[in-house]
Amino acid sequence: GRDHRAKGMLRYVGQHYLQFAETGEWFIKGGADSPENFLGYVEFDGTYRHGKAGGRRRGEAEASKLHRYEPHRRDWRPGDPTWRDGKGRNIIGALNYLASKGMNSVYMLTMNVTGDGKDVWPWTSHDERFRFDCSKLDQWEIVFSHMDRLGLMLHLITQETENDQLLDRGELGIERKLYYRELIARFAHHLAITWNLGEENTNTDAQRKAFARYIHALDPYDHPVVCHTFPGRYDRIYEPLLGYEHFEGPSLQTNDTHRQTLRWVTRSVAAGRKWIVCLDEIGPANTGVKPDADDPAHDEVRT
């Protein structure tokens, strides 16, 4: 079955694929990268849009409102979780739908303050950095636990390019340490997690290494740590991380899928630490992976 609870913790074992601890099954990721503000959901406590969201670009959904996922209400099933007298059915239904289509991972930001969506954060308000919203995080936990049952990895993007200097001006200071500590304390027990240092990340080499080292020091389950960057910046971002003991691989944004995947697989072997190389954003941005009707074999994203 799909339920991760029958498979054990998903671990990095020094190979190019993650492996479930109990069954030994290898994990080949295939999932949803959009919407990145998946947790910007209208029925979570303390969730609102601060300021004006980023402008709507070609191929994007309306940016002015929180997600409702109304078409997926019908995908909720009796016995599935809810909170506060029936809230949460739509987002739970959305996850049911993804699992029914064979997906096994969902990419989502845990903080987009001052970013594109401006509607996801773990604190009591968008301008708070030290007090965490317990009821909201309890509701996230309900969703994440359902993902375990559905066999969906939590690919948690801890920041994005617009806000990667927001906490401690980009350093590993008290704000960032508390943020990482809260995420790990609340959610690291889940069986399949990837911690992503940031979308289109602009921190320094030293900062990225410090973040990864700190996360691994705190996470008792040693979930993999990866990082996403801009196309064209792979060498600048990933080369200094080759062989680094606290980093497990790149989170690629490209339409040159085969060549870049092979390149970083090969380079990681040469550096003595095999990476899991994942393709997490496929260009062009306004289409990504096309619908089955337009590209039935999805050959465009395999080349």
Regions found by a protein language model. Give the residues of each.
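Short microdomains enriched in Cys/His and/or Lys/Arg
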Residues: 6
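Ligand-binding face of N-terminal immunoglobulin V-set domains in extracellular IgSF glycoproteins
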Residues: 1-3
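Catalytic-core region of carbohydrate-active enzymes that cleave or remodel glycosidic bonds
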Residues: 220-222, 241-303
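Active-site mouth of glycoside hydrolases
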Residues: 9-249, 253-259
